[in-house]
Amino acid sequence: MMIDNNCGKEKVWVPNPEKGWINGDLIKEIPGEGWLVRDENGKEIKIEKDELRMQNPVIQEGIDDMTSLSHLHEAAVIHNLIKRYEINSIYTYTGSILIAINPYTKLPIYSKEMIESFCDQPVSKLAPHVYSIAESAYREMLNFQKNQSILVSGESGAGKTETTKFLLQYFAAMGEKGNGVNTSLISEEDIVEGNNIETQVIKSTPILEAFGNSKTLRNDNSSRFGKFIEIHFDKIKGTIVGAKLETYLLEKSRIVKPPENERGYHIFYQLIKGFNNSCCLKNSSNNNKDEDSSSSSNNNIDDLKSLLKCKASDFNYLISSGCDSIDGVDDSQVFIKTENALKVMGLSNDELIGIYKILLSILHIGNIEFEKGKEEDSSIIKYGNSSFGESFSDDDAGGYNPLEISCKLLGCSVDSLKSTFCSRKMKAGNESYTINHTVEQASQARDSLSMFLYSRLFDWLVVRINQSIDKIGTEKKDNSFLFIGILDIYGFESFESNSYEQFTINYANEKLQNQFNHQIFKLEQLEYEKEKIDWSYIEFSDNQECIDLIEKKPLGILSILDEESQFPKSTPSTLCTKLYNNHSKSKNFEKPRFSQTHFIIDHYAGKVEYDTNLFLEKNKDFIISEQVSALESSNWKFLTNLFQILSKKMNGGGGTSGGGGAGGNKASSSAAGKSTFKFTSVSSQFKESLNSLMTTINSTNPHYIRCIKPNTEKRANLFDNVMVLHQLRCSGVIEQLRISRSGYPSRLVYDNFIKRYKLIVAKDFKNDDDSNESKEWNSILKETDLNSSNGGTNNQIELKRKGAELMINKLSIDISSVQFGLTKLFFKSGIIANLELLRSQTMINSATFIQKIWRGYTDRKAYTSTKHSSIYFQSLIRSYLQQLEYNSMVEENSAIHLQSLIRTNELEKQFNQLLSTTIHFQSLLRRLEDSKEFNTLMDRIKKIVKIQSLWRSNLAKKQLKLLKAEAKSLTNVVAEKNKLASKLGDIQSKLDMESQLAQKIKNENEQLSSQFSNIQIEKEKLQKDFGNINLEKEELLLKYSALESEYHQYKQQNELIISKLKQHINDLEEKQHQHSYKNNEVVGNTSFEGSTTTNNGVTSPPKSSPASPIRNSINSNSDTTISGSSDDSIDNTDSLILSPKQHKGEDRKRNHEISSISPPRSRETIGHDDDDNNVDVIPRRQFNELEKEYKELKQMDETHKQYIESLKLQITQLEEKVKKSSSHPRSLLPGIPSNINDSPKVVYTKSSITNDNSSSHHQQQQQQHNISPSNSITSTTSPINMMDSNIKSLSYKDFTNSQEIDAQQQLHQYHLNNGTNPATSTTNGSGNPLSQSSPTGSDKHIQQSTISDLVSALNFNNCQLESGKYLVDLIIKNHDSIVSKYVPSEMGGIPEPAFILSRCFLKNIYDVDATVIGTPNSTNSGGGSGTGVLDPIETNVNILIYFCDKVEEVIYRDPKSNCSALCYWFSNFYTLFNIMETYNQDTKDQLSLNDQDKALIEKLKITLQTMIVKAHKNVVKNITDYIQPILHKSLNDTTSEIDFMDPITNYLNQIQISLSLENCYINNNLCKLLFEQLFSFINAMIFNEILLRKDLCCLRSSIPIKMNISELEHWVKLHHGKEWSSSVCDKLRLLKEVVYILMIDKTQLQNDELRDEICPTLSIAQLKQLLTMYSPDVDSFEDPIPLEILTSLMDSPKYNPDENILLDLSKIFTLKFINSNQTLSSSTSSENDLMATINLNALESVQYACDDLVSNIVKKNIEIVSLNNQKSIKK
């Protein structure tokens, strides 16, 4: 298959003088003349074959590296840049060069998220950007340990300065990352400010802009000097350790004479307009208040104030150009920024004032005017009638005198400076004489002084900046650091009129271009050598001849210029004559036809004609020694120091070349010799500094950025083709393309080449299946399909190379146009374009063939369908016709049949009529015959009947006669009568019997009805009685409950009174015995049994009468658990701590236990229960007993009252004893708390009860006689019984054992321990008491210390502060083992430290009745000695703050702390914060706090918030430090598919972040917040990577990303089936939309409705960036994204060009405190992030075992008390 380089009708580029290049169509080839082309206007043009410029394939439009273009020429480059500029893609690669087009608008592509995305990424994967060049330089510096340089060039207004700023911004961020700062998680406000090195490097830019930039016609902020910034980095860490700045060729002529419609340097205008806002004025006002302030400094400020009441129009230097402002720029505001930058650099107020005074003196020097003197060729200073200084004339009665003002500002003599303007001294041998200056020469001397002052000020500023940012020093440069140099210098310039500045600029660019050419050629060589291909014949263009023309000695242009500059009578003509004579034969030098003062140099970018009229003047840098001497003799210290610093710098060899005046400094101090004018050539200085710069650059690895100015109007979205093309030529881009084009610019790896173009040769190999070549191709094709990556083993690469060779042979490509490298194919320019055309044509042909096959298939299918339809239709027609014929036949047969039926009917009718007539006639005949026969028969019968009647008559008559005879006989009559009477009697008897039986049945029925009515009445009565009984039962129960509650109320009141009385007694006894004891511990227990009499004669209340059976049964059951007044029974018991559920509602359950106990029921009751659904009816007798018991309780209350009266009497007796007695009886020691009888609950566990009834009865008796409830209560509340004469030492165990638990609570505990129901376990089914079976043996009672005991232990001996801190230390000391400890509660597990601290300290802060009793030996510090009363709020707040500080010190600062531990402590602080907030809400109306207490509580709240923020940051840092590298590694690993799900989920499973937080239910919001933030972080990271990386923004990468996202969502829902799982997964919605877009047809996105449906979250700007970065896979048949889609998106009203397309990672991990006025971090969207509901009652009911803590705290308190007592004894 032979490739024709111009096959088909192709597009070409046609030259156009206005647009540069326009579209054209290739028509035909004209032999011997070239090609005939038709342009877009329809005009036909002939183009030579060598000048023909082919267009590239559509797939290569807008590509980001123009060396990948198939046709590499100017037209293709311009077209590609235009296409990219239209979609705001301002950066484009040309090989290693980055082309940056000024957009003239702000683009959101320089954010910190963009910096983070470019960090540590290969340049090939990222879109072109200035950050990619910075990243490449930074990584190469660290990886290869070699210095780097970045050369930024371009003409004025192209954006060089802004590009340099972005480079510095990136390097500053990299320096921060080297210091361990995660820049992705800090906001813009958190970026480091101040005087660190990164900030100082960045702040040097506005200073240099103010003093070295000015407004020009081309640029409002044009740099008028070149600069080279070295950023010094640490070799290992990559942190910024310093910087150094060098400047080149300051344009000094702009100081005294700015070009028309341009400005001088910005600082002059900023000073005039912004000095009133200067910080110097504010500082001076503050200094005026200080008595020791310097008066001279204030005088300087006053002078400046008066002199700066002026305008720009008051100064000659500022008004001469006719421009003094910039549109859209406020010089006063810029001045503030400049001054702030100077302050950052470390300049003091005096130095700032000195700068302002020099600037102002320069302006006033410019106002000095001259006029002719009396002598010939002389001049004098013009006084009065000055054209300038109108603002100063009114203030001075003598008129405005600029010379005097300048001298006053500079601190030098007016006479010494005045003489230097109007005359100069000359020496001839030993004689000297004075020569007068003309007016013109005097003006030159004046301007020379101004330029000298400004250039030295500029040089001094550079020195001061270097002193500030050069932290290491030049002496360690070669060993201690690496550097990246940034060169910001003019680009090549070629105007209509080119002067000395353009000559020096172009000379510098020639040198840089020479270095650039060598570098590009070197890179090409390295690439070819790496791939082992032949490159020796590649041509290389060298501009060394042009450089030699300019600088080579002795006849170079610079040498001739310096020579002519030293001759007094030299002119531009003489200069040009020498140039013509020496260089007329040079190919790079030309003489213009019509000018004797111009010459032409053929530079690399084109020919430039220079005008020499100002060459000689601008090359001279005259320094008048008298002026220098006058300045050095100034009495102003700042000015003299300035010259001294510069002199030392110059003599030390480290001077800057700024201003080109460095050489003058060396001679200025010793200028008393030969001439007062010291000649210094600007060109020689520049050449020297340029050579030094080139030496530095050549020692580095250079990178290139070419800034392009798109138009002269400074408008956005305007592209001037011709202007851009000119800049590309001048910047060396076209030359670089020529170098690339001369070699093999198109390069493809073998794998990509085979995948993309295999379809072109597939048909050829298929047609020859049996050949060896085809078999080999098939095997290679399978191998390349199996190995999709670009790499592989050497055998695989060799196999792919063979496949590429087979393809090249099949494609018939000229072997001279192809080179086979080790891993790549190298093609000459145009080959790839032709391959793309062939691929496109093959795809079109294939599509056509597929369409043909498809159309054939569809047509055949349609024909077959039509044929079948036709046959079917014909059959239907035939069927229809046959149906018609059949119907006709049916009708005919039917007609015949009908006719036959009709005829049959007619004949039948006739037959029937005849038949009926015949029959009728026959019947008439028969009737007639029968009638005759009947009549005969009737006559015969009549005769027979008559005979018979006569016979019967005779017989009747005979019978009558016989009857009459019988009637006459009486006997027969009587017998008959009797017979009838007897029959009647029988019947009557039967009737009587039946009547009696009926009456009996009736009576029985009536009796049964009556009985039934009685039963109904009785039933109703019984039901009514039963209801009344139930009501009565309920009333009695209510009455009993009321009586019992009233009893408890009386009981509590009495206990309160007794407690107060006991306290009063204790106080009196302590006063009486206050110095009778030296020990602090009391040993021994006091038993409280029955009514006893103490040594003091106090009698306890008498025993109450025996309780009721119910009470006895309760006491008998509880006796087994209560019997614990002795130590032995307590020590031998088992331990079982009550759970929170057991404690909850104990009082309510105990009250229910009494009411649930019922007596034995009678047999009648049981039987009645069986009849009526077993309804239990309690007898009234039981309630009578309850009433009786209540009366007994009332009697007990009366007894208590008597006991109180006895106590009062005892108090009176004790008071009398205190007054009379000189000795003091023993009392309780201060170590026993005052609330000893309100001690914490002691929890007892499993106790056994025997089944023996006698044992139970014995216990009942013992309960009745010894441990009645009243006696028990009374005994425990009496402190008098504790005052035994043998008191020794009171330990904490004795202290807790002296406490007693209520009987009802013990009964409830008994039921809980034995697993029985208190409501049903008392009685069995028969009403007998139920005895629980248990193992036989002695009862055991073991006591464990709970949280209440810990609270009491902390109060023990009033050492709460020290013991509290000791408790915190105990908790923190074992933090590794405490991580997994959670206290069970109704709210789930509560972290142990938070639970303990909230119960022990936080609760005390909000306890309304909380008081801390201070003993005479207590102190404010919580110790056991001293005086005063402790503030409970202050003490508890201090302990909690101590806890926070301790956790931060031990946990947060420990680098070994893992995420699980951090989450645990995060949960602790979160729980404490929520408990505190709940206390605040519950007690806000009850607490009355003073201002000090409120401040303490607020301080604690802020501390907890701060700790939550710190904990959150530590957790986030731990998570992100692990997950971020996983994501980076997964997305950057080219050897395997993207897989970040498994490492992330494995990590989360290992640290168990969810379990560490979810053990406590109140952490649900916290856990949700962390997971949402984590998934948002993953979403943002991957989303930002996709938007900026070409290798991820494709279909091939979207599939594994989608799979990972789906698996991650599945993991969350599977492991965390919470209601917030969906909200967590929803954080990935933006990423899911992006992945979906990558997998669908992108043309759908042009439709607004479809776009809103596909990606509702994605913004238009983000979508445009996504489509811009998208590129089809190598072997994909998908077309590139049409630029029309991108432009349509940019035209959408929703498109915001200023939008930051990347997601801000720093705003993800934030917290919000709703109920706080403190703003500790930026808020999130959810208002419930840190709020949870806390049930304080449930929390306070939890009893938690803490024996070790209690024992340790008690020991600590005893140690504290002992230590304090020892101290007091010593005192």
From Swiss-Prot:
Location of the Myosin N-terminal SH3-like domain: 7-57
Myosin motor domain location: 61-840
Comp. bias regions, Basic and acidic residues: 1143-1153
Sequence positions that bind ATP: G154, E155, S156, G157, A158, G159, K160, T161
Biased composition (Low complexity): 1112-1139, 1253-1281
Alphabetically ordered keywords of this record: Actin-binding, ATP-binding, Calmodulin-binding, Coiled coil, Motor protein, Myosin, Nucleotide-binding, Repeat
Lineage: superkingdom: Eukaryota
Gene Ontology cellular component annotations, sorted alphabetically: actin cytoskeleton; cytoplasm; membrane; myosin complex
GO biological process, any: endocytosis
Domain Dilute: 1427-1695
Coiled-coil regions listed in the entry: 1180-1224
Stretches assigned to the IQ domain: 843-872, 866-895, 940-969
InterPro entries: Dilute_dom (IPR002710), IQ_motif_EF-hand-BS (IPR000048), Kinesin_motor_dom_sf (IPR036961), Myosin_head_motor_dom-like (IPR001609), Myosin_N (IPR004009), P-loop_NTPase (IPR027417)
Gene Ontology MF: a single term: microfilament motor activity
Bias type Polar residues, positions: 1077-1111
Chain's role: Myosin is a protein that binds to actin and has ATPase activity that is activated by actin.
Family of the protein in this entry: Belongs to the TRAFAC class myosin-kinesin ATPase superfamily. Myosin family.
Subunit composition and interactions: Myosin I heavy chain is single-headed. Dimer of a heavy and a light chain. Inability to self-assemble into filaments.
Name this protein carries in UniProt: Myosin-H heavy chain
Source organism phylogeny: Eukaryota, Amoebozoa, Evosea, Eumycetozoa, Dictyostelia
Gene giving rise to this polypeptide: myoH
